[in-house]
Amino acid sequence: NHLDLQAIEWLEDFLLDYEGTVIVVSHDRYFLNVVCTHIVDIDYSKVKMYVGNYEFWYESSQMMERLIKQQNKKAEEKIKELQTFIQRFSANKSKSKQATSRKKMLDKLTVEELPASSRRYPFVGFDMDREAGRDLLTVDGLSKTVNGEKLLNNISFTLNHDDKIAIIGENEIAITALMQILAGEDEPDEGTVKWGVSTSRSYFPKDNSKYFNDCELSLVDWLRQYSAAGFETQNESYIRGFLGRMLFSGDDVFKQVNVLSGGEKVRCMLSRMMLYGSNVLILDQPTNHLDLESITAVNNGLKAFKGNVIFASHDHEFVNTVANRIIDIR
């Protein structure tokens, strides 16, 4: 947590060279792939060890689940076939022995009950209300100084159609300053940021405290306030649909937002982004506070998104699989 990509790489090398035993808990999939030789999986109220890295564990666990489901399906089909035969011919004298034989077969067949997994995958899907035109974003000569420290110095770049840009660098404060300027939350000291008239933007800030502190609204009312102008009275089932995607269901939607955990607040902010229907997404560390299942869901959602993305992340796998361009702030 809180390490940039270079620091994470250093830690990976250190642990690989370390001759002792390492027990690590991490939500970084790439890190687990590089460092780990064994994975201890705590699920289904059991603890099970896999020999291999994170990717091996994931494929093995998914394959085992698929295998059990396939076996159950075959068993259920066979049970149905036997039951049909028994019901049809149990009263038939010439077929009674066959019916009795099939009843014995039926008694031996079992369907393995899959226990409930503790893992829950949210659904992250961003739909655009409209596509952006050709002119998206031009950043020219951007500079910013905060408390006497030059964070951004003459930054220039353009956002092209289908671009998904990862912003990386050693200075997190500088990256956040750039994201805030792009989102219109702050102004540069020098330079210009020009967005195309057809763009609509949604911003995920690294610090979301201003959205939740001192707010006593319920989850459903909190999200409703971000509905499009004129739709503040959007029916509850519509709003709850977005919350449901992020695993808020039942009475959860009536919880006050100021008592939510860090991960729950992040899921709220993602619900808010999905509600907006923007064609450009700006995200500053969207995987902070999330578990592996939620990180995977966000990762897949951004990969599938048809619009443009500008994001900052310390998650190597996230950057590798989402971004088609990298901007390194030095």
Which ranges hold each PLM region?
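ABC ATP-binding cassette signature C-motif
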Residues: 1-70, 129-330
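Flexible nucleotide-interacting loop at or near the entrance of a catalytic core
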Residues: 63-152
